[in-house]
Structure formats: structure tokens, C-alpha cells
């Protein structure tokens, strides 16, 4: 989607969009252009659309007066969704009148339009122009770069699995790091075996493609401690020998959305030059069946040295995450947020719009909650305590099991498993985005597929 500065550079078929609050008068320039005042003829309730043809009086064919409703009731998400739907309706060929709007609203309008116009398959570029006497180009560029970061995460998740193997995730992360000046490290099976990352390697055994452990560093705050964003990057999940059903296997390319969204958050932070020190650790592998694939009853030794009895090969995400979490701590992270499409149980509990949150720190959770309130992403805290830890530790042959049969409290049990690998003094949050990571029906605001869940909230956590 391209952006131009003035409507003079616009095509004849484009529309001029004028967003107005309830009670606003039509800008004098628009009245002069039309030759009459239409203020009393239009309704400006939220999501009302009033169109009028210019009859050759302007370089655009029509003017759209978009009702924003009452100013105090307009939320960021409502504005983004409405503007995004309008952008898709007009196929991006739209000029936006921005003179009457403040910086935050300009950001949300451009962000919503840019987000909504994303498509995995290449299409004709939309052409977003703007009309304003104010200096808003910086605000627009900022919104574009942030939307580009979340769309990058969405694109990684939406890419077909035969084009997005672990090495492809690593190559994408490398390109991004080099473009943004980030330090990076990519480990392959040889290094992972030498360091003892047995949980990640165990999951990888059935795949024809080697695993990758990808680490990026963004240093924007001198010698301050690092926070790690740890992402699950299962590029395709067959379930292993606990094989998924046909319906359950469909869309399992999206099982890497945790890793993709972590990379998107890093792009956002680096582009905006946020004052923070953040590392991203993404464990990438397929979970497949094959002659060497791991099986139930196997015992894996994790990077931490703790042993894990495999009771379900389809509970693989927590296995690759536990090694990534340990590695982040070895690299000096003092705070950890792990992100994963981890359990179907969280969908049963919270549906498809909320992200489940688990933590060992009320202080850290309140910071995340404040960030989520700012971005208007929906989160909900769920329990993780000794009731769940005691079940995870019930193994006769290892320190713990990777899954507990019975299907009760599955999201909390998965979180408890991960917390077993959090060292003393480390603040930790687990985000289960199994429900919020994708949408299976293309809404007016966004296309079918990956949503980029929690990218913006993770970034907002570091923005002061």
C-alpha cells in the first residue's frame, strides 16, 4: 500500500474520506469545494457512511463523510476497524482528510487501513493519500512502520509450510536483523546437540529439516537488563505419533505464530527505537512422523538438565519452549515473556478473542495489563499454582511429564510445565495465543489467517 502526500497526486477514481465526530461541522474547504453546506444533511453516528459525488468539481469522484460518533466514546480499536473496513471497501484508493484529527487518531486511521489492506497473495497496491495543512508525515510513517511489523508477523504465519521451514524462519530473522542493525545468532542441530538442547531436538527428530534456535538482540537502553520474548516456532504440526485428525491438522502452519509475533514485536521496537533492551528467542522446528520421530514413553533431557517423560507427542510446543526459555536465561534475561499457540484448552476457556495470561509476578502482570489496555488487546489471567505443578511432576521415570491425561485444566497444566524451567528471581509471563493468533473468517477489518496477536501489546510494554 502506497502513501502520497496530497490529493493532487491522486487518481480520478479515488474517494476523499472525511472522518467527523458527531456534532462536527463540515470543513470550510469541503463546503467550498461542493458549493453548499451539507452539515445538516448527514448523520455522524459511529460507522455511518454518507457519500456525495463531486460532479467534476474535484480530482476525486466522491466524498465520503465517515461518522465517528461521540468523541469520548470512540476507542482506538473502533476507529481502526471502521477505517480498515472503509479502506478495503475502496480497495485502498482513498484520500483521507486529516486536518481535524490529533496525532493518536491519525496513527490509528493509517494503522487500521494499512493492517486491513494486508493480503498474503500479491494484489494491486492501494494508494492512500492524505490532505492536511499540518505536518503529519512523521505520524503517518510511524503508523506505517508499526503496521508493517505486525503484517510481517502475519505473513510469516500465513506462509504455506512447504515454503516456511525452520531454515526459512531463520533466514527471515537474519534479513530483518541485518536491515535493522540487530545482533543475531542462529544455532543448528550440531550446536544444539553440543549444548544439550534435548527437548527441542527430540521434537525435531521426525523432520527432514533441522531445527533452528534463533536469537536477536535489540539494545536501546545501555547496560540495562534484558527482557526476553520467547516464541514457539512450529512451522508445521502433524501431532507426531499422537497424530492429529484431518480437521485438527488443517491450518497447523499457524503453529509458528508465537515465534512470528515475537519477531514482529522486535521489528516494531527496533523501528521505533524504543528505550529498552530486548532479546527474542525463537525455537523453530516441524513436528512430524518418521523413522526417527520421538515416541510416547521416551525420556528427553532438556537444556536445563531436567528430564521429561513424553506422554503425548502433540504436546510439543512446551518442549521446544522449555529449551528456548532456558537459553534466554543463560544469555542473561531477567524477565521472560513466552508466546505460543499452546493449548486448545485456552480456546475452550476464553474463546478466540482473548489471550490467556499466566505469570509468577503480579507486578509484571500489571505492566502487561496496562499495555494491553492501551492497545485494546484482550487478555485474561488464568491460574498456575502448585495444584497444577504437582500433576506435571507425576512421572516414575523422569522429573516430569509433558502432558497430563484427562483434559482438565490443560492451559494451566501447560503453563505449569513451562514454569518448571523458570529460575529463581526471574519474572515470567506466558501468553497462550491459541485462540487469538488467527481468524478463520475474513472480517471487514482483517483478512482470514494470522492476526499478529500481542505484537502491539508486547511492544507497548516497553514504550514509556
Residue ranges and their predicted role:
Residues 1-4, 43-46, 58-60, 163, ...:
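A generic structural signal for tightly packed, nonpolar segments enriched in small/aliphatic residues
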